Amino acid sequence: MVFFDSFLYNGCMDKKKLLLIDGSSVAFRAFFALYQQLDRFKNAAGLHTNAIYGFQLMLSHLLERVEPSHILVAFDAGKTTFRTEMYADYKGGRAKTPDEFREQFPFIRELLDHMGIRHYELAQYEADDIIGTLDKLAEQDGFDITIVSGDKDLIQLTDEHTVVEISKKGVAEFEAFTPDYLMEEMGLTPAQFIDLKALMGDKSDNIPGVTKVGEKTGIKLLLEHGSLEGIYENIDGMKTSKMKENLINDKEQAFLSKTLATIDTKAPIAIGLEDLVYSGPDVENLGKFYDEMGFKQLKQALNVSSADVA
């Protein structure tokens, strides 16, 4: 079900609500949510369209539920960032992006253009850094912020003004992280969530962490010592063990991992909150895009909703 009425409003929202979407990871989730139907999702030109379709469904669901006054979809600009300059193997070893997914990316951006949604990328930075920077700017300006991603890196940004939603299953199921929920689930604060990643590493991003420290051990250390810094301040008092030996040997690696895992909230972005006002789609061109993609049901729903609004 697609809720087109939700994005055909005229933007007259009383409350300032910012929706920030990690475009690359959400698109990837959309691709695999409909992967079993990959061959069914092709347009007349032979383009695979499952990621585009799934991304549209996710957007429609979020727009209807969040009702943002402002919105941005952030993308990664490329594989080279300030983090790869710091650690060449960062995100190394990832599997090749499927061609069926790669070919859809330009059309996801085109979809956003027709929907009237701003998208942005910044050389040398990741989508997370763009999101983190705008999140802090929006907090200072009195916004309520919803961040949506396909992975958990952005959980570190949750606070009293910011909810971080992680895509779980399909195109409409999300797990919402607030500071209270994070404490309830893991016993950690958002700042400690970064330290946990520094300790245990992250295989998906190829962040090394400390040898043989997993989630359970990492949480135990943080509950005892408060932070990564606290662990090393108290390490001399720890009883002799293989874990202590690994912590000592991998100290430099642990602090490098923390730097790699920490989102930059002061990225030199060239856009501001005033550029992110959402006032709805270009219905005519969005309809033409649906025709090109072969999205008959979406086109029909768009026509019905736009007629009702008119």
Can you name each region flagged by the protein language model?
Residues 82-84, 156, 271:
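Generic domain-boundary/flexible-linker signal
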Residues 13-17, 246-250, 259-310:
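Low-complexity, acidic/Ser/Thr- and charged residue-rich accessory regions of DNA metabolism proteins
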Residues 49-52, 102, 125, 254, ...:
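Electropositive phosphate-/nucleotide-binding environments in soluble metabolic enzymes
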Residues 13-118:
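Domain-level signal for Mg2+-assisted phosphodiester chemistry and nucleotide/NA-binding surfaces
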